[in-house]
Amino acid sequence: MFVSTPASFSTLAHELAPVRADLARRLAGPQRHRLLQGYPQVALMRSSDPEHARRVHVPLDTNRELILGVLPHPFCNPQLSGCGFCTFPHQRYASPDARSTVEAVIAEVRARTEAEAGLAQRKVSALYFGGGTANLTPPNAFAALGATLADAFDLRGAELSLEGAPIYFLTRQGAILDAFQGIPARHRRLSMGVQTFDPTWLARMGRTHFGDRGVVAQVVREAHARGMTVSCDLMINLPGQSLEDQRRDLEIALELGFDQVCVYHLVLFRGLGTAWSKDPEMLAKLPDNGTAFANWRRARAFLLERGFVQATLTNFERAELHATDRRFRYEELSFTPATTDGVGFGPAGISVTRDGWQPSDPLLRRAIKRVSHTDATAYREAIAAHGAADQRDFVYTQRDMQLLHVTRSLPRLIIDRAGYRADVGSELSDDFAPQLAALAEADLVRLDPDAVRLTERGMFYADSVAGLLAHERVTRLRSRRRLPNGANDAGPVHMG
């Protein structure tokens, strides 16, 4: 459907032409899920160190909501590197390395809550244990980490999430669940990386030892018996995967009683660097974007027709759960940077925070993004030496704040105009006029008086939407080779 644009969006044809061409190029390419980490991507961030991080650190505003992302370690143990498809950094699991890394995370929590103003004893709205395979953490080490976090923060009103592979929720008589349940919280939830129930595909992923349908069913029963909610990640558009197989995965997830189902379109293309991206047969069987979009629409319709609510781009929740405070809050809050700070601990931990000084003029507000070392050894060494492990940082300019707001809002399917104005002090239609016009013409967004809303097509191509909005600024950041102190440098990056 063609969506006409209001007069306020009228621009000269020569201004729109390059934007339209850029959008067409993006729509023809692979559609990644780069919205999870948020703007900017790591490659656009300046190389940092703990001493530099202390200089650019800003005190937190204790009136804002706070979420914590805690990565106990970066280790995993699939039989195939990255399960064939995963682009996130993982290292081969070894128990001694995992234990020593968790000890370093504990040290980081203690050091940073002591050193960073506005952090210690803060009320936490949601905490997410992620990383390599978080539930692969030795249970006693996980319990010690949980106790440290409970001492450093007020978790009594928090949602806690624990991510992992199905089988490790059950090993040692559910010891990791016992440790998880020992952390004070308002609500607890498990996030399982199921990917598929198909035994053939699990073998191709090197995930047969992570548990079959029976194991997954047992985890769901155990979690519900403990008062926890449970979500699963499922992938669609696997090479050569039939519609029947995609639908069957969704049917099984509902039969098993999952409270939330997260549906992910496979990211795979030549040159990606994953094991599957080097397999010509896999690449040859990939659906084109049009087919992949049609498959995603069917998956979305299947869940909506069965009483699920689409909470974000990828997360579908049972309607009766979504209407309560037991809905998935961490993701929801992570997509509202105007009101929420996110602080990360552990290898590859990400923090995006704003300062506690809140002038009436939004143009004077400051924000910074920091990313820790991803390698476990480098992370442990940095913590031992400095009590912090910053590898990259990025100080937001006003234009960057605008991009942070719009790109983080996209996963929530809507950019509220009044919220944007209150956050950055300008009008959405003025700041992104040609981009919004091109996106509306392509039926990717609907331009309503109160908000910009993703269409169903825009949901699937949300990565292209974000890239188009960020393109001009990202191009400028890419072009810089030597920057003055206080600026941001970066090498090539795809987002934008």
Question: What do these predicted regions represent?
Answer:
Residues M1-V70, L119-R122, A442, R480, ...:
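Flexible, acidic/Gly-rich N-terminal and inter-domain linker regions that tether
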Residues T62-A104, A203-R204, T208:
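Canonical Radical SAM [4Fe-4S] cluster-binding loop centered on the CxxxCxxC motif
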Residues S95-E114, A126, N135-S426:
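C-terminal scaffold of the Radical SAM
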Residues F129:
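Conserved phosphate-interacting/catalytic interface
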Residues S426-A438:
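Short amphipathic alpha-helical interaction segments
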Residues A440-D450:
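A short, conserved structural fragment
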Residues A451-T455:
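Minor-groove-contacting beta-hairpin "wing" of winged helix-turn-helix DNA-binding domains
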Residues M459-G496:
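Short, amphipathic alpha-helical interaction segments positioned at domain boundaries
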